[in-house]
Amino acid sequence: MNRLPLRARVLSECFRSKSLDPVAVVEHSLAQIESHKHLNAFVRVSSEKALEQAKQSKDRHDANSPKSILDGVTIAVKDNFCTKGIHTTCASRMLQNFIPTYDATVVERLQAHGAVIVGKTNLDQFGMGSGCIDSIFGPTRNNWSEDTNDDRFRIAGGSSGGSAVAVAAGLCYAALGSDTGGSTRNPASYCGIVGLKPTYGLVSRHGLIPLVNSMDVPGIMTRTVDDCASMLNAVAGPDVYDSTTVKRPFESIAPLEKQMSLKGVRIGIPIEYHCDGLEKEVLETWTVIADMLESAGATVKAVSLPNTASSIFVYSILNQCEVASNMSRYDGIEYGHRSQEDSSTEQLYARTRAEGFNGVVKNRILSGNYFLLRENYDKYFQKALKVRRLIADDFVRAFKEVDVLLTPTTLSEAPLYKDFVQSNNRDQCAVQDFCTQPANMAGIPAISIPIRLSSRQLPISLQLMGDHFTERNLLQVANWIEKQVDFVANYS
């Protein structure tokens, strides 16, 4: 077979029946990664470690004692999560030679469940982008592209584009992404897979190299909602190494209902998401699914999130302020890239950062430092914090009326690379993250699910958002939609 067509749950059953074994699956995955190198999804492949983990998994299955449903399942990890003994670069020259001495908590937990880590995936440098094009390893190509040569390919979305393509192209079963303003859901939408941003604090950020501490969340990328639930079960829960995780234990999500009743489920349609730039086919898809939900017994009603128009500006200000703070640790002295020009401490510091960061990162640092100047602090940063609270309050009011919000994930299908690069990074993110970043501002869970193909044969996806810690309900509704549209069976 050229792809990995099975769900993790079905794969686990195959392992149990001995019709497949983990070593064969990992060997197939490694072969697929090699044959799809032109997509540039992976920046590093951990073949030896993966085969070693696969052999251990096979031994457990042979003894009928697998660790979990994920035992032997191939997983990719975005290259901003620390992996012990494996380079973690954030796709930046600044960390090009960084080899962590520990695993991120989410990586550690997946391996504790028997998952096999096959490699690290591409991203925009330090996660700053929405196209997966600003990387020292070059851009990632969307596997749905009509043409993957030169600059005629479709972008994968970002910043977790490598993880999205790895799953969509069948190179692995699932992948870790990170989500600060849509970096898991945006590429999931463009690549036709499922992308979950959990509630802030539900999944540990320990070992995730920070971009925006108050919004960063580890994301989950899979081909089906059921696999997404299995991944969440493995990684969610409190962590002593991350003080922002909630202290209560995570209640595992049981296998999702195949025939869920929508009676009594209240679906909200935010009127502000019907915005400029929303493509006709995306709007039509949104309408069709809303009608489908209503026909199945759900109550569908319009709701208002009045501060949505301000959200992208507030997100941009807060993002750049936290970036300026987080990037200040890279000075060429403690770790990371070190310039050869070290005639003085100031010269070393300046040259290290000039050489180590790309233009996008430097621009965000510059903007963030400007907003944080004493004369600008109240005018920009403090005001942005106040509006962020208003945005969060919009969601609080909305979830008193409805259980789930249904919106587009992105305003369009995946753009062509040659068109995408005509805009600067800030303008790109303002368009690509319009529908996704409000969930990060409010800290609520959101999931992108593929619905159908456009007239250009490219994926169109929709997003569901729920109140804090309602992942179970969110996944149930997403699973119901997935069963109706059957994207995997129809288009994969």
UniProtKB/Swiss-Prot annotation:
InterPro entries: Amidase (IPR000120), Amidase_dom (IPR023631), AS_sf (IPR036928), GatA (IPR004412). GO terms for molecular function: ATP binding; glutaminyl-tRNA synthase (glutamine-hydrolyzing) activity. The keyword Ligase applies. It is an enzyme of class 6 (ligase). It is found in: Mitochondrion. It holds the Pfam family Amidase. GO terms for cellular component: glutamyl-tRNA(Gln) amidotransferase complex; mitochondrion. Keywords: ATP-binding, Ligase, Mitochondrion, Nucleotide-binding, Protein biosynthesis. It catalyses: L-glutamyl-tRNA(Gln) + L-glutamine + ATP + H2O = L-glutaminyl-tRNA(Gln) + L-glutamate + ADP + phosphate + H(+). The keyword ATP-binding applies. GO terms for biological process: glutaminyl-tRNAGln biosynthesis via transamidation; mitochondrial translation. Its EC number is 6.3.5.7. The active site is at 78 (charge relay system), 159 (charge relay system), 183 (acyl-ester intermediate). Allows the formation of correctly charged Gln-tRNA(Gln) through the transamidation of misacylated Glu-tRNA(Gln) in the mitochondria. The reaction takes place in the presence of glutamine and ATP through an activated gamma-phospho-Glu-tRNA(Gln). Belongs to the amidase family. GatA subfamily. Subunit of the heterotrimeric GatCAB amidotransferase (AdT) complex, composed of A, B and C subunits. PANTHER family: GLUTAMYL-TRNA(GLN) AMIDOTRANSFERASE SUBUNIT A, MITOCHONDRIAL, TRANSAMIDASE. This is Glutamyl-tRNA(Gln) amidotransferase subunit A, mitochondrial. It comes from Anopheles gambiae (African malaria mosquito).
